């Protein structure tokens, strides 16, 4: 399913929906870790934020017991590529399944490094993840997250 990440400055990224299919508006932040995506998702410091993972392939070792807390905290999740077939003897499921279970909307297939560059140059801003092609840009700027 087609999805969009719309930043409050009007920048639009088109990709594919992952996780929950609900709309999300939140502050967009980034993480440059090469591993530890599950720890990022379960880290309470990301509460109220949508996390951009800059490493290009996420989910390759699936969901393991290595959680920082018992639930996921981010409002949204943004990746370049999501592994469909994790490979790990400790794997208990896929990242896609985890995002769905935790009701976290996300988007894949966008240039996360270009997005990170925008955030570094322009500073903190809100963004929306949606599957609705008739999104309201003004709604993003009005959001108090």
Show where each model-derived region lies.
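RNA-binding accessory domains that recognize and position tRNA/RNA substrates
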Residues: 1-144
């Amino acid at each position: 399913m087609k999805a969009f990440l719309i930043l409050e400055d009007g920048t639009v990224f088109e990709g594919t929906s992952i996780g929950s299919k609900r709309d999300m508006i939140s502050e967009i932040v980034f993480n440059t870790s090469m591993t530890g995506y599950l720890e990022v998702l379960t880290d309470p410091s990301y509460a109220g934020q949508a996390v951009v993972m800059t490493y290009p392939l996420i989910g390759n070792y699936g969901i393991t017991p290595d959680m920082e807390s018992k639930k996921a905290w981010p409002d949204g999740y943004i990746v370049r590529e999501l592994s469909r077939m994790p490979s790990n003897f400790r794997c208990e499921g896929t990242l896609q399944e985890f995002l769905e279970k935790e009701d976290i909307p996300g988007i894949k297939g966008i240039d996360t490094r270009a997005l990170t560059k925008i955030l570094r140059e322009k500073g903190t801003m809100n963004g929306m993840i949606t599957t609705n092609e008739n999104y309201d840009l003004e709604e993003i700027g009005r959001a108090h997250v």
